[in-house]
Amino acid sequence: MLKRIKSVIIGAGLVLDYMYDNAHRIIMGVPRLSRSQITAHLFLGSQYNLIGLEKLKALGVTAIVNMRTTNSYNDAVHEGIKYLHLPTPDNTAPPLETLITGATFIEDEIKKGGVVYVHCRQGLGRGPTIAMAYLIKLGLTYEDAYARIRAVRKFINPQASQVKRLKELEEFYSNSE
């Protein structure tokens, strides 16, 4: 019974979160594009709901990277999907170690033939930051990684602190070669 109540409360929270997100997008003029394909094995988007999780599974997603501070889903929901939660407050840059952890997780999953979905709340700042971290790990410059993602997700908006941290990551990888 308690499990059922918890499930209903989480579900209600997700519905409210989804409604808020859509209202915010309409007011701010941000498109409602839920996900963008960055590479053959990497998708970037906003927080998904339970229906969206089924769509991700249908796309072949084998791993999820969540950049939100909240973790709305328990492990049972992600049955069969690897899950990395890297809690990062909105409009802030994740620590360098977090970018390295996320980029390595994405790279490892893709090398195994997996498909990764990266998200934050709206897919504007934190999600694109970790996706760019992966592309930088592959050898792209920050500018090239940004251009690649912006080509398919025009409304990304990394904060100045996130850009600075990504440039630090680029320097880290170029010094470790």
Short names for language-model regions:
Residues 1-27:
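Non-catalytic regulatory/accessory regions that flank a structured catalytic core
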